[in-house]
Amino acid sequence: MMKKAMIIVTLVAGLFVAGCSSSESKEFEVSFDGSVDHVHGMGYAGSDKGLYFATHTGLKIYRDGEWLETTKNLNDYMGFNAVDEGFYTSGHPGEDSDLPNPIGIQRSFDGGKTLESVKFEGETDFHGMAVGYKSHDIFLMNPGQNSELEQGFYKSTDDGKSWKSVGAQGLEGELFALSIHPSDSKLVAAATTAGVYLSKDGGESFQLLTDAAQGTAVFFNEESLYYASYNSGPSLVKYTIKNGEQEELLLPDLTEDGPVYIAQNPQDNQQFAIYTTKGQAFLSNDNMKSWEQILVDGKVK
């Protein structure tokens, strides 16, 4: 009889813990029906199949056709990068945060519930930052001198413990976006007012890929670089790393607009997402053969 009672108590305790865990998860993410403004990064973070948008007021998530927002850590996220375990970010603390301003480089491996300082907390807000999806190597543009770095381009291959200055020779124009290959950190791409650039030596030198077009977005998967540019209209191109072939891809109808963020679902390589200058977001489930709009002028659908 005693043994049976102990089993019942154990089962009830287990159900209570599971219930608390489920409740905590639901409390952290709630349904969202508003506007997604001031987006400074987008991607599929960790093993979560949700598409994360880093905004002025925390994280907004599109998952299984539903929009969600987080209820804590409502920070002004900048330089957001999704990785295989979660995300890395920079920016400024929200009203509910006790983080110093700016927040330096932070990372989260639990969907944004908690943040861990990587480097430069209270010193620098990094807008131009790329993090390898698998390697977690960091490539960034430091906007001004801090306690360790001068102004310029740097990379870290040990999670921010040490930094190496890189030359970025040939890279011209005002920087809009950076991307680093998921696992091969010799490959770095940049989008600037002068075009889209590719480096094959870890950022020491860059070569121009575009002709008379402004670069707007860059994104790597293992095999390819996807980049967006704008001349008389928007363009989305797949650049195959192995042979340098370039393929023009289908974009939705965009009037005086173009992609500023590109993402691919690592759990479903047919699924891509883009976010545009005017606050439109589109999802493709067939490798960019067609697009479904999920944000209209920043308003969720």
Regions inferred by a protein language model and the residue ranges of each:
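Bacterial signal peptide processing site
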Residues: 21-23
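Short loop/turn segments immediately following the C-termini of beta-strands
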Residues: 56, 92-94, 141-145, 193, ...
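Short, solvent-exposed loop/turn segments at conserved positions within beta-propeller repeat blades
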Residues: 96-102, 144-151, 191, 230-235
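C-terminal motif of bacterial Sec signal peptides marking the signal peptidase cleavage site
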Residues: 16-19
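Hydrophobic beta-strand positions that form the internal "hydrophobic ladder"
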Residues: 51, 87, 138, 187-188, ...
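Asp-box/BNR beta-propeller loop motif
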Residues: 57-70, 74, 102-119, 152-167, ...
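Beta-strand-rich domains and repeat architectures in extracellular enzymes and scaffolds
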Residues: 31-60, 72-79
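Repeated scaffold domains used in trafficking and secretory/extracellular systems
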Residues: 39-43, 75-84, 123-131, 173-180, ...
